[in-house]
Amino acid sequence: YTIDSLTEKGWREAEFLSERLTKLEIRDFYVSPLGRAKDTVSPTLKKMNRTATECDWLREFDVLIDRPDVTDKKIIPWDWLPQDWTRDERFYQYDHWFENERMLASDLKGHYDYVTGKLDELLAKHGYVRDGHCYKVVESNEDTLVFFCHFGLECVLLSHLLNISPMVLWHGVCAAPSSVTTLNTEERREGIAAFRMSAFG
């Protein structure tokens, strides 16, 4: 970011967000180390007299690649032109999107695995252990966890929890600043949980 903080409008949005979040029973807050995320969470923490755990892996997913439409510098891996990314069928597949030559050159999968591995470590501490494409419920609970992060990173987390290619999310959804995405765990059979998204952006 050019300015790693909030604009005047951004501070107003963070205030509105705090009015929404202070009505919830929140177990833990987790926040990116970047100034924008920390400033966005600050009104909520102040009103609730709480603190947030800062996680380096929640910073924006700013791994740089050689994107086809930008020839003079490396750039973030989303916001491709539709005519470029939609031609590679691998981008639509949860287990093949990273095989594109441009992604391989920047080890996108390695960075992706680091972030999603950290997410799984955190979820395991809250009783949910990754098991294939689902989660083994070690300790069933209704804890609400709140993450203050960034669009590109959010799509990485969602792609892992929902087993979707991040390319589809990076190019198919749009999240406004200070917006809220909600996921719930669903345990249709005892001991096995899956994540379902009930609201985005």
Residue ranges and their predicted role:
Residues 97-134:
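Internal catalytic-core helix/loop-beta-alpha segment
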Residues 3-19:
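Short catalytic helix/loop segments, enriched in acidic residues and glycine
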Residues 150:
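Short, conserved phosphate/pyrophosphate- and ester-handling motifs at nucleotide-, phospho-/glycolipid
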Residues 17-95:
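Phosphate-coordination/substrate-recognition cap region in phosphate-metabolizing enzymes
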Residues 26-33, 134-136, 144-147:
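Short glycine-rich phosphate-binding loop at a beta-alpha junction
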Residues 13, 17, 37-40, 111, ...:
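Alpha-helical packing segments of well-folded alpha/beta enzyme cores
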Residues 61-75, 79, 129, 133-144, ...:
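Acidic, low-complexity terminal tails and accessory targeting/binding regions
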Residues 3-7, 112, 169:
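Flexible, glycine- and charge-enriched loops at secondary-structure boundaries
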